[in-house]
Design a protein with these regions (language model features):
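Arg/Lys-rich amphipathic alpha helix in sigma70-family domain 2
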Residues: 66-70, 80-100, 120, 172
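Internal acidic/polar
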Residues: 2-10, 95-123, 151
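Short helix-capping/turn signature of helix-turn-helix
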Residues: 31-34, 42-45, 143-153
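Structural recognition of an alpha-helix C-terminal capping motif at a helix-to-coil junction
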Residues: 52-59, 72-84
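Short, charged helix-capping/linker segments at alpha-helix termini
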Residues: 2-4, 18-27, 37-56, 163, ...
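Sigma70-family region 2
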Residues: 18-19, 45, 58-73, 92-93
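Short, Lys/Arg-enriched C-terminal cap helix and immediately downstream tail that follows
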Residues: 69, 91-94, 139, 174-190
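Helix-turn-helix DNA-binding module
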Residues: 128-165, 179
Length: 190
């Protein structure tokens, strides 16, 4: 089904829902649930939080569908709701997305512009791919520090290793990560 057909079918389902057919909204949820959930997981990287965000997205859509003007596709509208919920979650929980730069992490862009969000997601995908190539002891330390936001001491406690070892693993792991990312980017700037 192409986008025009999907849009036409979405419009019909919306009209049926607005006329009182609850099953029409259920059909919309079935159609978009996996895509919205996948988007939420990519942004927040926490399965339970992504599930909550997905459910909240559809709850908000259910309540606001009478005001949906149709200026954009239904999926674009759901996408925007999802991104806003994800950004709110990230702000609320002070979670940060890892970068390969010298700073520990940088927050997701505050703008909900889809192009900016997609660029951030692509950068995160590239970083995660590079992280996956690291030896396990470096990978675990970097994930716990940069993706989970744990302190060096908390990581040392979890891994039952000295604090200095945690710092060394993260430092050396980041060097390897930068080298891997440069290779991925054909020696482009980081």
């Amino acid at each position: 089904m192409d986008d025009d057909e999907r849009g036409a079918e979405d419009h019909i389902l919306i009209q049926r829902f607005l006329a009182g057919e609850e099953v029409a909204f259920e059909r919309l949820v079935e159609r978009y649930y996996q895509r919205i959930d996948r988007l939420a997981q990519q942004v927040v990287r926490h399965p339970m939080a992504a599930e909550d965000i997905t459910q909240e997205c559809f709850l908000r859509a259910y309540r606001a569908l009478p005001q949906f003007r149709g200026d954009a596709s239904l999926y674009s509208w759901l996408y925007r709701i999802t991104i806003n919920l994800c950004l709110n979650y990230l702000r609320r929980h002070a979670l940060q997305v890892s970068t390969a730069q010298d700073s520990d992490a940088s927050a997701l862009p505050a703008a909900a512009d889809p192009a900016v969000v997609l660029e951030a997601q692509e950068r995160e995908r590239l970083i995660r791919s590079a992280i996956d190539t690291l030896p396990a002891h470096y990978r675990v330390a970097i994930i716990l520090r940069d993706l989970e936001g744990l302190s060096y001491q908390a990581i040392a406690d979890i891994l039952s290793i000295p604090l200095g070892t945690v710092k060394s693993r993260i430092n050396f792991g980041k060097r390897l990560l930068r080298k891997t990312l440069r290779a991925f980017l054909d020696d482009g700037p980081l």
